[in-house]
Regions:
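Gly/Pro-rich, tryptophan- and cysteine-flecked surface segments typical
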Residues: 1-327
Length: 327
């Protein structure tokens, strides 16, 4: 899994900290060993050994209350004799006294050689404030690993920038702050993180909007690419202000034609609006490019006070991934 310590960086001025929850998926009690790493691969502190009861037992580990962890960026690797699941929460350090900000992602149990992120940003304008991203890359192998990060601006067919990141130590994470990338223009991008040579990595991303909003999510490994995705719940301009963005990235290796990617939505029985939503991409999608839908701004497609499940499908069976963001 990936985890950050207390930190403030250019993409955000917040003092972020983490906690993670481990869940034992076995009927047997077990112990989890947690190794903490600094970005240079050295030990951040001595390993923790944490008991986790069987049958869904949990252990919650808070980095911001650990006196042995210095302020800064880092990563963690968790091992156990029994299968565990993990959830990482990023929050404001309670001692910082700042406006609350939070996000969460699933711990990564298996590395891959290629990861996809449908949406990242550098000083991009949005309806909810200026957007900036971190891309966090953890070495999940036993030797140093190098990667290339390709960033393709929305609407473009080729990467604007390919950034080589060399020699990430075992267990360590590299924090790529797009706000600090001088070679990148402002705007929204899709990203591809690919291992250069041998090894495997895990990837997550933080997307910051304005002063106080943050969304954390897992990148998609190449093994997850498919031609259809189901979304259990989409919100459209609810009375409590909830809205949804859907971003679909073309990973087929070639252009996807107009009308190939469909979005079909059925209202929940309790939805105030009972409209059925049916739409498709109105422009061709270049390789690694995206089509996006936004229930806040696309009022002609998405009625107000609507919620329900949706399905995304490629008529040509093109390989895609889909990112859903709630705001």
């Amino acid at each position: 899994g990936l985890t950050a310590g207390m930190v403030s960086a250019q993409a955000t001025t917040k003092s972020l900290a983490t906690n993670f929850t481990l869940v034992n998926l076995s009927p047997n009690d077990t112990e989890a060993t947690v190794n903490y790493y600094l970005p240079d691969g050295s030990a951040w502190k001595d390993p923790d050994v944490i008991p986790v009861p069987g049958n869904g037992g949990q252990a919650i580990v808070r980095q911001y209350t650990d006196p042995d962890l210095s302020d800064g960026l880092g990563s963690a690797a968790v091992t156990s004799l029994e299968p565990l699941a993990g959830l990482v929460q990023q929050v404001i350090d309670p001692a910082a006294g700042q406006v609350p900000t939070s996000g969460a992602y699933a711990a990564i149990s298996e590395g891959s050689t290629v990861w996809y992120i449908p949406q990242v940003a550098k000083n991009a304008s949005s309806a909810t404030g200026i957007a900036n991203s971190w891309i966090i890359i953890q070495n999940l192998g036993m030797d140093v690993v190098s990667v290339n990060v390709s960033l393709t601006k929305y609407g473009a067919s080729t990467p604007e920038l390919v950034t080589p990141i060399a020699d990430i130590p075992m267990g360590a994470s590299y924090y790529y702050d797009l706000n600090l990338e001088a070679g990148l223009s402002t705007g929204f991008f899709s990203a591809v993180v690919e291992v250069d040579g041998t090894g495997t990595v895990g990837v997550v991303s933080d997307l910051f909007f304005g002063a106080n909003s943050m969304m954390s999510f897992n990148a998609f490994p190449v093994e997850a690419v498919t031609d259809a995705w189901s979304i259990p719940l989409v919100y459209s301009r609810l009375t409590n202000s909830l809205v949804t963005s859907i971003v679909v990235q073309n990973l087929s290796g070639s252009e996807i034609a107009i009308g190939d990617i469909s979005l079909e939505c059925t209202p929940d029985p309790a939805s105030p609006s009972q409209a059925t939503i049916s739409t498709a991409n109105t422009a061709a999608i270049p390789a690694n490019g995206i089509v996006a839908w936004n229930t806040l701004t696309q009022t002609a497609i998405f009625p107000a006070t609507w919620f329900g499940p949706c399905k995304i499908d490629s008529a040509s069976d093109a390989g895609i991934v889909s990112l859903v963001l709630y705001r």
